[in-house]
Regions:
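Short, charge-rich amphipathic alpha-helical segments embedded
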Residues: 34, 140-177, 262-271
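Phospho-regulated, low-complexity intrinsically disordered regions of nuclear gene-regulatory
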Residues: 55-116
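TPR repeat positional signature
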Residues: 123, 127-130, 161, 237, ...
């Protein structure tokens, strides 16, 4: 995805563009590291950004040029701590002045910038901005006082009741979810639905770029309530990994899925695990997991592409995989989808050095196994087995053997 698309997506969903938000969305920055930085546990955010500095600066400058082209206004943001002992301390984004300047900008529409004289003359505007900061930093008691102050200053404020709801929900997230064991999943799912349908739209409307920080404790609360719960097809989004995904906490996503012995049988979990590996820079494991998903979801009866699998593939963010997928779809002679796993493996021959026997065992796809056996025989210089494996691959699909011969 280009930086232009990233800017467009943020403008559409949050009304402004923030480089920090892009880093989190793109997986270059783990939310747990960002949160630790805000809590004063990390002194320099750049150390935890998984992107080469030169490339990062290039991408951020490209985004700035596009923002300027759109007529957006860049405002410098002060990033301060979320704890009492660092609440007034300006946090360090980077040791590089150039990168600090780029990361500290938020780009907003001209119409969203309050006129300075109006801002200075209207105390309710000042209070509202303090309230937004208190909500983002999870200072619920301070937010309570600021809501009362806003009411005293402007009892008819259009968003007053919305802010009251956000403060009330913030207090609500401080207690664990109270659910009877026999109704646990149902109760947690009701919490999730309320969060997604009511709180998230309100938070994005009122807090915009700061909504992620406000919402994180709610998702963490749901995730922690679901830890150890196996996937339940009746409540597909009531799995800890789903809640962790909303926070872009990919380490926790990976852990919660691998801790569920049933994950290999569920497409949602396999795709989420593949994404987690991708954003954790474990590319080979990501592609292998995606092959497991393809094997699970592909319709072997008529060899056609399953609709839900196609949706997964269209959302998968790996550029090399997408290129292989596109080449397969663009072949002059249309091939049955059942041979796609073998096609992927032959386009990603390095995968054989990373595949564990336990990962192969659940895969039933004949084209994958034939391609794998051939690549292993070639790697081991076993000419007899390679010849037999070539015949086996040819019997499954001539095109796959042709592809193998092209790369060897």
């Amino acid at each position: 995805m280009t930086m232009q698309h990233n800017v467009d997506n943020q403008l559409m969903s949050l009304g402004s563009y923030s480089p920090i938000e892009w880093l989190l969305e793109a997986g270059h920055l783990q939310y747990s590291d960002y949160e630790a930085w805000r809590m004063g546990e990390i002194d320099n955010l750049e150390k935890h950004i998984d992107s080469p500095t030169k490339e990062l600066i290039k991408n951020l400058e490209q985004a700035e040029r596009f923002c300027a082209k759109l007529g957006l206004i860049g405002e410098t943001q002060d990033y301060r701590g979320w704890k009492q002992d660092n609440a007034f301390k300006e946090l360090t984004l980077s040791q590089s002045p150039t990168l600090t300047k780029l990361l500290s900008k938020q780009w907003v529409r001209q119409d969203d910038i309050p006129q300075m004289d109006l801002f200075m003359d209207n105390p309710s505007v000042v209070t509202e901005n303090k309230l937004i900061e208190a909500l983002a930093s999870r200072q619920w008691d301070d937010a309570d006082k600021l809501v009362d102050q806003l009411y005293q200053q402007d009892a008819n404020h259009a968003q007053l009741h919305g802010y009251e709801d956000l403060v009330s929900f913030g207090h609500h997230t401080e207690a664990p979810i109270d659910a009877e064991p026999q109704n646990q999943l149902e109760t947690i799912d009701e919490e999730r639905i309320g969060l997604e349908q009511e709180i998230i739209p309100l938070a994005r409307q009122l807090l915009q770029q700061k909504s992620r920080d406000y919402l994180a404790p709610a998702w963490q609360r749901i995730a922690q309530s679901l830890e150890g719960q196996p996937y339940n097809i009746a409540y597909p989004q009531s799995h800890a990994s789903y809640a962790w995904e909303q926070m872009q906490n990919w380490k926790a996503v990976k852990h919660s899925i691998l801790s569920d012995d049933s994950y290999i049988h569920h497409g949602e979990l396999l795709f989420r695990l593949s994404l987690a590996y991708h954003f954790l820079k474990e590319r080979e494991q990501s592609v292998i997991t995606l092959i497991q998903l393809i094997d699970l979801k592909a319709n072997h009866a008529d060899s056609e592409l399953d609709d839900s699998l196609e949706n997964f593939l269209n959302l998968y963010p790996d550029a090399n995989f997408i290129a292989s997928w596109q080449r397969f779809m663009d072949l002059e002679e249309e091939q049955p989808f059942i041979v796609f796993p073998g096609w992927i493996l032959l386009n990603e021959v390095g995968l054989i050095h990373h595949i564990e026997p336990a990962q192969i065992k659940p895969i039933k796809n004949p084209s994958f196994h034939a391609a794998y056996e051939l690549l292993v025989a070639k790697r081991d210089n076993n000419e007899t087995e390679e010849l037999e494996a070539r015949k086996a691959l040819k019997n499954i699909n001539v095109l796959l053997l042709t592809l193998y011969l092209q790369i060897h």
